[in-house]
């Protein structure tokens, strides 16, 4: 699971990293919590979106989706084909349960100042018919060095796969599994 992440980069860094053509809205920085508005990347655009899907049938926000099942689940399968996004983050946080305590860890990669978290987004309309963008973060089984902290982690899209993730109409579960299983990042965790 990914329940919080960190944004400590400058917006101009996103323009360079993702070769953006345009941006829309403003967003939060610092430690990000579900429901907050953050910049996400959709093709060549940065769009401010709220973290978490609000569905009438769910009594809580859906902030994560298991990457292993997004092409099977009714909630996600159409979004997985056409509404993929990247959530730029500097790090993410997980809590390790030890006895009756929870220890907070900041997890990051020294070689990447901005991690590209894989996400899905959808557009809905509020009661006044205003357009609202919302996203969820894809998760996978945690990498070996992270498993002792938490059994899940965000899917990170590496630079070589960014364009395919954002633009391709041919991503299916097999291709997503390849992207997930061929990550070359090396994560570090620090107690906060």
Briefly describe each language-model feature range:
Residues 1-192:
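Short linear sequence motif anchored by a di-proline
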